[in-house]
Regions:
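Extended C-terminal regions of large enzymes
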Residues: 1, 68-612
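Glycine-rich, N-terminal phosphate-binding loop and its surrounding beta-alpha-beta segment
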Residues: 1-29, 49-81, 86
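Glycine-rich phosphate/pyrophosphate-binding loops
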Residues: 13-46, 126-142, 289-291, 296
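Long, continuous compositionally biased terminal/linker segments
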Residues: 41-54, 603-605, 609-612
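Compact, glycine/acidic-enriched structural inserts
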Residues: 44-48, 60, 154
Length: 612
């Protein structure tokens, strides 16, 4: 719904494993129900039913709790239930997400992880599915029929030992999870502020990791799957809601994760952690992607500041930076399908077109500052100085998410991609490697959010080679097939290229769709340039070969822009070549034959689109 193209999104929680153990490798749902329904998959009984659901609540924190109680045989059986749902926003927003539940036996409450990106929640509700429930209570270490349990145990012992000994010295995931990132991003000028204008802010300390250490409940294991030692799925217990339909209620809030902290926090100028938590809760229960919502609000706030829209258009809301109350009201309107919030719920690409058509906005300006690629809002990192992450956003198949190529840390913090060739090669390797996790239902965090003590001494520390070896053991241990790291990448490469071709069939998947809004590459406005004038002037002298002293700010911006766009074009060429694609970003016939995906319709599509 958001990109009009191919989408996949992954989430933690119990649904995926329970579905597999119940006997299903995949679930395909065709058609549209005549009334609201719940699909119930009882793995214990070997039965699937479709049941009418006219009275159950729609928002996820209520619905999942009710269904968990309904379909569990007793209180102990609640941990055997997982629910997929999308809240009321899914009836109105293009970027509605899915909530996947699990039952926290220590808290005795239902919790969630999200498949957030791309609007899959909208698809669920369009089919009039209120929820999918799976039950499976027979789980053991043998449930997935492993071929060699000792190999799996070997990998487990190694990673669990590292987590126990090193996590507190590295990212402290077990206490604050991805909440450790805001101060690092702020320090390196990478924290998005005011719709990605800036990368740091004086009030960023209000969103510091120490704040989340205090707000997250400590002392309770927080893994979103059995046996996860990293246990990073933190939450805020006993949170008092201040707004919306549940005002005054005390709730458990899952998160916030970094993307939410930076999105509905710094990127819209909100540095109140309690406001961030409140928006986190309502985005979750309504079924709203926090990244897309945050960027849509940030874009609207910048357009409000620029005079493109005003209070008459926003229904009286003052969309100024830092107005958390206005942002929350937009969120509640979005969920109801009312007011200006309903427009915000359609995403940045829609807002750009709407503001040009209805309010006479400058098309170039809104294109430059509307932070989306392929219709998907950009994840919450400032990329002006990271050519690698620019490629990570622009060249990603699905749009500008960080699932395929989260390179910002290795590029800008650890400085592991110093050369142009390093960046181009990373954009070939990491999308394939990271796709492999999604294909196999595995979390990426035990791969690179904890690393061996000697990782820096390895030949390729950015790949964490010891952990790559872990996954070859896991694959062989489960399937009985011995594999190398190259074998794992080949699995992904077939899927990755096929997905690019499917996008091509749908009218996308070429070079023209791989460009970024310029703000992701460099400064758009004089305000931005002057905020980092020393840096940009130095780059003009040293990299572009231009003396900036005689130039106006506007001329400096134009010269720098021409240089940075040319660098990005060069990067596209280098990455396409490594991927086996032509200069237009289309997989070649040679590549699809090499991968064994040269089906007749694939060959015909490539010939049709390339003319040869």
């Amino acid at each position: 719904p958001l990109t009009q193209s191919v989408i996949d999104s992954n989430a933690g929680g119990y649904f995926g494993p329970y579905l597999k153990f119940a006997g299903w490798d995949a679930l395909e749902i065709q058609g549209i129900a005549e009334q609201d329904v719940i699909i119930v998959i009882d793995g214990d009984a070997g039965r699937v039913t479709v049941e009418a659901a006219p009275l159950e609540p729609l928002n996820s924190h209520l619905l999942a709790a009710q269904l968990t109680e309904m379909y569990a045989t007793d209180e102990r059986d609640r941990k055997s239930i997982s629910v997929v749902s999308a809240g009321q926003a899914a009836e109105h927003s293009r970027y509605a997400s899915l909530n996947l539940s699990w039952y926290d036996v220590r808290r005795k409450q239902v919790r969630f992880k999200q498949a957030g990106r791309g609007g899959s929640g909208r698809v669920l509700r369009h089919k009039r599915i209120k929820a999918i429930v799976v039950r499976y209570s027979q789980m053991t270490g043998e449930s997935n029929n492993p071929a060699n349990m000792e190999l799996i145990r070997r990998a487990g012992r190694r990673i669990n030992k590292e987590i126990a000994e090193l996590d507190s010295k590295q990212n402290n995931m077990r206490k604050i999870g991805t909440g450790h990132l805001p101060p690092i991003m702020d320090h390196f000028d990478l924290l998005p502020v005011h719709n990605y204008r800036y990368g740091t802010h004086p009030d960023a300390s209000n969103l510091d990791s120490s704040v989340w250490l205090r707000l997250f409940t400590q002392g309770i294991p927080d893994g979103c799957w059995y046996g996860c030692t990293l246990s990073c799925a933190h939450g805020v217990d006993h949170f008092h809601l201040q707004t919306g339909p549940y005002k005054g209620e005390v709730v458990l809030v899952d998160g916030p994760e970094y993307e939410t902290i930076a999105g509905v926090g710094s990127n819209i100028g909100v540095f109140d952690p309690l406001a961030v938590i409140e928006m986190n809760f309502y985005c979750d229960t309504y079924g709203v992607d926090t990244i897309s919502f945050a960027n849509s609000v940030a874009f609207a706030m910048e357009c409000y500041e620029a005079g493109i829209i005003n209070k008459e258009i926003t229904g009286g809301l003052e969309l100024v930076w830092g107005n958390a109350r206005a942002a929350l009201e937009l969120l509640h309107q979005l969920a109801r399908g009312e007011g200006f919030g309903h427009l915000v719920g359609q995403g940045v690409r829609f807002l750009k077109q709407h503001f040009v058509r209805e309010y006479g906005a400058d098309p170039q300006f809104v294109q430059d500052v509307g932070m989306e690629v392929k219709g998907m809002e950009i994840s919450e990192y400032m990329t002006k100085e990271s050519l690698a992450q620019q490629g990570g956003y622009g060249l990603a198949l699905k749009g500008a998410q960080h699932d395929e190529a989260w390179l910002i840390f290795m590029d800008m913090v650890n400085k592991q991609l110093p050369t142009f060739e390093d960046k181009a090669e990373a954009l070939h390797y990491f999308p394939l490697w990271r796709t492999w996790f999604s294909l196999h239902g595995l979390c990426k965090l035990p791969w690179n959010d904890i690393v061996p003590a000697n990782n820096k001494e390895t030949a390729e520390p950015h790949k964490v080679p010891e952990h790559v070896e872990n996954y070859t053991w896991l694959y062989e241990g489960l399937t009985g097939t011995r594999v190398t790291a190259a074998d794992l990448l080949a699995q992904s490469e077939r899927v990755y290229n096929f997905q690019r071709l499917l996008a091509l069939k749908l009218g996308f998947g070429t070079r023209e769709h791989d460009y970024l809004p310029y703000r992701a590459m460099g400064p758009v406005t004089p305000l931005e340039y002057e905020s980092r004038a020393e840096r940009y002037d130095r780059q003009l002298r040293d990299e572009v070969g231009v003396d900036p002293t005689s130039l106006t700010v506007e001329e400096k911006i134009a010269r720098l822009r021409a240089y940075r766009v040319a660098q990005y074009e060069r990067l596209m060429d280098a990455v396409y070549k490594r991927r086996g694609w032509d200069e237009n970003g289309i997989p070649t016939l040679e590549k699809v034959r090499e991968l064994g995906i040269d089906l007749p319709e694939v060959v015909e599509l490539i010939k049709q689109k390339t003319g040869h």
